[in-house]
Amino acid sequence: MSTLEQKLTEMITAPVEALGYELVGIEFIRGRTSTLRIYIDSEDGINVDDCADVSHQVSAVLDVEDPISVAYNLEVSSPGLDRPMFTADHYARFQGEEVALVLRMAVQNRRKWQGIIKAVDGEMITVTVEGKDEVFALSNIQKANLVPHF
């Protein structure tokens, strides 16, 4: 997670939780039109009105604090079936599920891995890939998503 993403997470966690939602994570994607993507969840699931409520509240906070120096679009959504993973707690919660990982730095000459989440030990994640356990530092995981099965 970048320094900006950490700062944004700290700023918006309380307002999101005050509305009764879990802040799953955020992504800031820089580009011609940058995007701040916020993922929320709740035990009852998420609908469009929930996203609108959070968007309104978070927009107010961001307008006051103004932490982003470039123009951006704000997107608020549920994590979806291919839920992104951001914290060790997320991996622990979905232990036994299949995950696709993209690493910051290659391990065994590979940056992309896919397997079953076997264990979480502090900041280390064990994933079973093709019958073999591989251990990854959470800090080396650039992107991770659950792999949905239909």
UniProtKB/Swiss-Prot annotation:
Keywords, ordered alphabetically: Cytoplasm, Ribosome biogenesis
Family (UniProt): Belongs to the RimP family.
GO terms (BP aspect): ribosomal small subunit assembly; translation
Summary of the function given for this chain in its UniProt record: Required for maturation of 30S ribosomal subunits.
GO cellular component terms, A-Z: cytosol
InterPro entries linked to this entry: Ribosome_maturation_RimP, RimP_C, RimP_C_sf, RimP_N, RimP_N_sf
Subcellular location per the Swiss-Prot or TrEMBL entry: Cytoplasm
Annotated protein name in UniProt: Ribosome maturation factor RimP
Short name of one Pfam family: DUF150_C
Keyword Chloroplast: no
